[in-house]
Amino acid sequence: MDTKSKVFLHVQDFIGRSAIFFIAPFYFLLTRIFFYRVRDLREIRRQSTAEFAKHKGPWIICANHLTMVDSFLLGYATFSLRQHITGYKRLPWNLPERRNFQSNIILVVLCYLSKCIPVDRGGPREKLKKTLDKCVYLLRNGHHVMIFPEGGRSRSGRVNKEGFSYGVGRFVRDVENCKVMCIYMRGDKQHSYSVIPSWGDKFSAQIEVFTPEPIAETGLRAQREYAAQIINRLAQMEENYFALRRERCRGFEGFREREEKHGFALSEKNSHR
């Protein structure tokens, strides 16, 4: 990566660090306005904090992708407001698709201040290579990077195990002493992909530290194999999510049946009135 690009990254990092005192409270206010909630929020934050404390080096944070604000929601779920301000370096850099925000100057500014490196998906390979080079440079300097290995929002509403991107595989291959954190997060009302989650949605999140199996392949094959391992892990976490959701639903149905059995159903009339 050339010197000019490095300087621009450091300038962006400095400006973002200065603006976090305003940006972080604004984002947290948005979660209140949209009434978004995360199950076991304290435990999720405790778990992520503990993992970051165990490994002080770079992290690649890999998550499923269903809405255009997933990065924001993941940041809210894993870092408290205080951690946003006091632990700015631990906040991951994000890779949003440029065409999703480039036509709105407010979104452009917010993305710049929120540690975002725009990606031109489907654009020239040289341009994509420069973006990936920036991420590798950041990781080698102890920063964290958040990436959606699927390469875009899943149109089926499930982890895309076929058309995924190989970019995350390059990070695993090229950056030593780098840990991978897989996060599966989904709202109860999220049946497919969307621009933003439904108002008042409640999210479930799982965190797993994943160590990809070493492979003998090199070049693009190595990138693909590493990326496939991460995608498969996210798919397993997705199955766990739906299994837990079915269990919750069965528990609710059982509770309702017990209420009705003991005469507590709301639809029944009280014979003592």
Language-model regions: role of each:
Residues 95, 117, 179-183:
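Hydrophobic/aromatic beta-strand patches that form the interior of the parallel beta-sheet core
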Residues 105-108, 143-144, 155-225, 255:
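A cross-family acyltransferase "interaction/gating" segment
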Residues 1-83, 87-91, 103-108, 112-115, ...:
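Membrane-anchoring hydrophobic helices of lipid-metabolizing enzymes
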Residues 124-129, 161-162:
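A conditional alpha-helix N-cap/helix-loop micro-motif detector
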Residues 92-99:
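Short internal beta-strands
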Residues 64, 97, 150, 183-185:
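Cofactor-binding loop segments of dinucleotide-utilizing enzymes, especially the Rossmann-like FAD-
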Residues 57-63, 142-149, 178:
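Generic beta-sheet signal
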